[in-house]
């Protein structure tokens, strides 16, 4: 008999056999453009249930440039995680993934874990190109060397 859907999803064998890590993992969550750190809280709460301690890093997505976000992220990582020996993982949505890429290029010594980017425009964004052309204030500092696709590898 096939498994029954639960909450709209089919259970997988991996989900049934996954064990929680013995020592808590640490993760830093980065939000996308025009968002606030609190939008990542539901994900942080779910991660906590699986013994992953996380913080939500907030930044002014369009008021500053990616290098400025990268610098602030480096300050936060040094302040909150430098004393820990275990890896720090990153989970990023949209522009947050571009901030992480810039951070990894600028501060490779601070990247000691894995990264997941969700809906990040790694190759640039056609929508951002149009907005930059017709309403540049809507994307501000996030465009140049970020949403335009000109980012370090």
Per-segment meaning from a language model:
Residues 1-25, 41, 45-52:
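Alpha/beta-hydrolase fold catalytic core
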